[in-house]
């Protein structure tokens, strides 16, 4: 989703050179300040655009930088608990698989893949059922439900997202098309 937002950026003193407009720097500074982070509603900001300064900036005594309110458009990646998502397996390890959903990685624990017990072959990058021919590997497209969501606002790469495929209509997209789902 795209949202109109307002926030404040810090424009360091070295950006205020004679003959240069602050508008030239606002785009780059706003992108650096906001992109690749979670907002206050735990939505991941992918891209910002149309940065417009609002009013005059403020200078804090002893700092020397300008603190400027900026209005901008933000393209957000939103996730909710129990939402059904699609992604591709990016890594297989002894406890399950990591699934790439948008800009984030989520864990699909081996106990949440099939009702059957599974065997993990880390070397081959596969997870397969013991009693059936169902198999997942790196690059396999899956549909899963988010069962736990703990965004880390200080470092989005450390966010914890848990998935399950143990419900009807979930699992490998290949399995689902074979079953007519």
Predicted regions and their residues:
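Single-stranded RNA-binding regions, centering on S1/OB-family and related RNA-binding modules
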Residues: 3-181
């Amino acid at each position: 989703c795209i949202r109109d937002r307002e926030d404040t950026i810090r424009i360091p003193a070295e950006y205020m050179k004679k003959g240069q407009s602050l508008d030239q720097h606002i785009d780059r500074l706003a992108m650096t300040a906001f992109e690749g982070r979670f907002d206050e509603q735990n939505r991941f900001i992918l891209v910002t655009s149309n940065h417009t300064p609002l009013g005059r900036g403020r200078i804090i005594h002893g700092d020397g930088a300008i603190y400027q309110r900026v209005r901008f458009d933000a393209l957000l990646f939103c996730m909710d608990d129990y939402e059904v998502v699609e992604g591709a397996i990016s890594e297989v390890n002894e406890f399950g698989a990591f699934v790439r959903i948008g800009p984030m990685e989520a864990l699909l624990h081996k106990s949440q893949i099939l009702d059957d017990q599974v065997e993990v072959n880390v070397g081959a990058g596969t997870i397969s059922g013991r009693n059936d021919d169902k198999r997942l590997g790196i690059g396999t497209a899956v549909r899963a439900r988010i069962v736990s969501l703990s965004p880390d606002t200080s470092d989005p790469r450390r966010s914890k997202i848990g998935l399950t495929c143990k419900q009807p209509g979930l699992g490998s997209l290949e399995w689902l098309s074979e079953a007519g789902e």
